[in-house]
Amino acid sequence: MATKIRLARAGAKRKPFYQVVVADERCKRDGRFIENVGTYDPNQNPAVFKLEEAKTLEWLGKGAQPTDTVKQILKKAGIWEKFVSKLA
């Protein structure tokens, strides 16, 4: 089972709010997920993201692949650098 760390859309029309979730890559965007690891609110200025660092690092260690957007969020939060330094 290939897992992805990706955004699941929530919120109202024209007011998106996203949950950062770990899901099987075959599931729908807003469908079933394995675990919720954070949130992302692009409506705030600047955009607000809250991630559970321990859970995120655990899933990255298990081989979950982040999408491009989530990878950028992880870099801004500093989690991606911690993961890469653990690998080295």
Curated annotation (Swiss-Prot):
One Pfam family in the UniProt entry: Ribosomal_S16
Keywords: Ribonucleoprotein, Ribosomal protein
One BP annotation, GO: translation
GO MF terms, alphabetically ordered: structural constituent of ribosome
Superkingdom: Bacteria
NCBIfam families reported for this sequence: S16 (TIGR00002)
Protein family per UniProt: Belongs to the bacterial ribosomal protein bS16 family.
Name of the protein described by the UniProt record: Small ribosomal subunit protein bS16
Species for this entry: Geotalea uraniireducens (strain Rf4)
